Amino acid sequence: MTVLEETQEFGGISRTVKHNGNRMDIGGHRFFSKDDRIMDWWKTVLPLQGAPSYDDKKLGRDHDMEPGGPDPETEDKVMLKRHRVSRIFWNRHFFDYPISLSPNTLKAMGFKLTMVAGFSYLKSMFHKLPEDNLENFYINRFGRKLYSMFFEGYTEKLWGRHPSQISADWGAQRVKGLSIMGVLKNAFQKLLPKKRSNAEVETSLIEEFWYPKYGPGQLWETVESNCEAAGVKVLTDARVVEVRQTDGAVSSVVYEDSEGNRTELSGDQFISSMPVKDLVNAIDAAGADPEAVDSKPAPADMTEVANGLPYRDFVTVGLLVKHLKLKNTTSIPTLGNPPIVPDCWIYVQDPGYKVGRLQIFNNWSPYLVKDVDDTVWIGLEYFCEEGDSFWNMTDEEATKFAIQELTRMQVINGPQDVLDSHRERVKKAYPAYFDTYDRMPELVDYLDSFGNLYCVGRNGQHRYNNMDHSMATAIEAVKDIKSGETSKDNVWSVNTDKSYHEEK
């Protein structure tokens, strides 16, 4: 078995970047799944903590510890249990994420706006719109007023398109069962003494998650080490440039190393997580060679669909600051001097800012930050297009822009508080649901015609899956290979089951 990784690091957008003793989680990854196979596998790779972490001990926080589990203060291979706190920043106010009918929300909105939003939601309950786009999907679940406040501008910021131009499929996969009724149902069930299973909790409403001591990249670094110990050949800086076929099956791939050298690798079964666009264009890419008589490049209509699949690219700027101007006005204890806000994420849904989300790495894991008591390590997430003006900024320009936004938001006092910075750019971070996306079924049929080729993962299926769904596609692919199952419907159907979309 051979694994080819295009870059020098494993994990893709789930990797962890190390910078001057601090660590950045590129996309922010909660380890939580309704699929017990995934949860069990995670804790096999990194066992759950059996003793309190640094901040748990210092703040007196309680978690259910794993009997016999490792102590994160003395051992590195450990999965932490973390409390989830996320909020929305809109109109200079903080709201619960997801939106709830809490006293804080009602106070921040005011009586008049609350009444308008309430009647708007009631109208949406009795007058359902056809869910032929993402805008209608949101309005049906939250009403037009809340949609216009919290979803319309943020979605356009994320995708660069108005929600009316985006397929409702994205909402079905990412928002799933979330709605005002779902929020109320969850609030009521929390009052009951019975402990609920993961499958009974809407993913967007979870209150606790797991997280590797040193970020998600630690998990994939551990997996790489385990694979090599088991005899798997792992190659980095190995970009697949051609997929060769014979008689309707993939026979080999050609990969290129960092020095431009090309090597052909033959095999019996092939699992691809490379972007669909790149995969289709790589199929017999040397077919234009007149001597390559057996080659059969992808049909023109399939390359048309593949090349039309859109992506949203991503830039994250890390800022190490002395302290926050933003005060912790919650009842949740935190580290810091003064104590920092408790959020893992802050969703910036205010259209006056380009930043989409803030991460406060101190709250994900205290071990991500070199000096967790006296500095705050923040990540600003920006959505853009490769080659646009924001993408092409220098590190200095992007850092200056990020500092200005945090200062305007009154999160920090200004550039005088910034101690260090780092920028990361990620291509094809988010598969998008417009342009030729509606023709994906044609592409799936074509790719499935290669009996020994399995497409898995977010970009491998051009589906905005969570990490656990991406892993489940690989598990299903391996199951098919081992059993001899020829249909790949189970691989493509991960995260399309109605249990993820509908209220139970």
PLM feature segments, named:
Residues 2, 233-235, 419-422, 454:
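General small-molecule cofactor/ligand-binding pocket signal
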Residues 423-424, 433-504:
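C-terminal lid/capping helical subdomain adjacent to the catalytic/cofactor pocket in oxidative enzymes
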Residues 20-125:
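Dinucleotide-binding Rossmann-like beta1-alpha1 core, especially the glycine-rich loop
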Residues 212, 238-397, 401-410, 489-499:
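Mid-domain catalytic core of redox enzymes
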Residues 314, 413-425, 488-489:
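A short coil-to-beta-strand element that immediately follows conserved catalytic motifs
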Residues 1-19:
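Glycine-rich FAD pyrophosphate-binding loop
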